[in-house]
Amino acid sequence: MKRSVRPLFSALLFAFFAATLICRVAIRRSSFSFASAIAELGSSGLMTEDIVFNETLLEFAAIDPGEPNFKQEVDLISDYDHTRRSHRRHFSSMSIRPSEQQRRVSRDIASSSKFPVTLRSSQAYRYWSEFKRNLRLWARRRAYEPNIMLDLIRLVKNPIDVHNGVVSISSERYLSCAVVGNSGTLLNSQYGDLIDKHEIVIRLNNAKTERFEKKVGSKTNISFINSNILHQCGRRESCYCHPYGETVPIVMYICQPIHVLDYTLCKPSHRAPLLITDPRFDVMCARIVKYYSVKKFLEEKKAKGFVDWSKDHEGSLFHYSSGMQAVMLAVGICEKVSVFGFGKLNSTKHHYHTNQKAELKLHDYEAEYRLYRDLENSPRAIPFLPKEFKIPLVQVYH
């Protein structure tokens, strides 16, 4: 009889703890939902069943076909002398004709430089030396390290808090964050006031808010961009790239190694922090998105192998979107994450603030939408994240 009581007692005890946690969530959150409470219950560790991932799929998602080209490009830039004469001598010493990649790197360096390539001033030398040092440090960190998710508060939130005058810097997350995407579906919404009520509002790629305040809000605490945006801004005087104000911090991921030069040259003129995403965080995001993309492709296309996916997704050019990484950043630094402006309708524009209608083929937005659904409803189904990392409450607004 005692043996039959113990399982019953354990079940009742678990139910008591679960109910207690759900009540705590209801009290703490002004907008309580049972689904959100269950999501937090799962992330709290009370639900301990492990998700079994497909090992073959995990291994394929970990392969970066662009890695050889990346390393070659970094080496070419590192060996590049900032005078044209030395550069010509560098390429003329090769036993083979310069490859297209080598010629492109040469053009990129020349077009990216804010000082003439032939300039021999001490300032030019200092910038060039600093750029190559930054490039080497950035490239060395490009590796898979799942615990990077546990370090995002120190790497991103703390420098921003210092800039904002926070006296006591802690390891606590922001209470609430809104990540505002650029989807044309926002034109059918009135989320502006709701977005602005969050402690932190993250916007993408300098999207306009003027004239769209009722739909997307007006508040901005973090501007998240890809390095192509800063590269364009770098052509302006003082690298001006602040549509939300000069005091708004910028977090940027590097699309191409040469864009580290834009970062090096623009950072001194920025009053607010200009932060580069840690390359280990970039690698993790790349693996997660590739996993979801391949899994979706195999399920929908009934493909026989991974080669078909590579042909259908731009091969080595395949990449996560800016929005995806901004969401993952919020997941790492916020207690509650609200996601707005992610999704599409055939009747709406691709971006609410531009006339662009077509999607970029190097992104798999549908796969990323699956990720957002898992963040909201099944956070333990997301691969590559460390077990000790707590995924916050995530709500996706459509």
Curated annotation (Swiss-Prot):
Annotated disulfide bonds: none
GO MF annotations, alphabetized: galactosyltransferase activity; sialyltransferase activity
Transmembrane residue ranges: 7-27
CC terms in the record's Gene Ontology section: Golgi membrane
Any one Gene Ontology BP term: protein glycosylation
Residues in the Cytoplasmic compartment per record: 1-6
Family the entry assigns: Belongs to the glycosyltransferase 29 family.
Function: Galactosyltransferase involved in the biosynthesis of type II arabinogalactan. Possesses galactosyltransferase (GalT) activity in vitro, transferring galactose from UDP-galactose to a mixture of various oligosaccharides derived from arabinogalactan proteins. Forms a complex with GALT31A that can work cooperatively to enhance the activities of adding galactose residues at O6 positions to beta-1,6-galactan and beta-1,3-galactan.
The protein, known as: Beta-1,6-galactosyltransferase GALT29A
Organism: Arabidopsis thaliana (Mouse-ear cress)
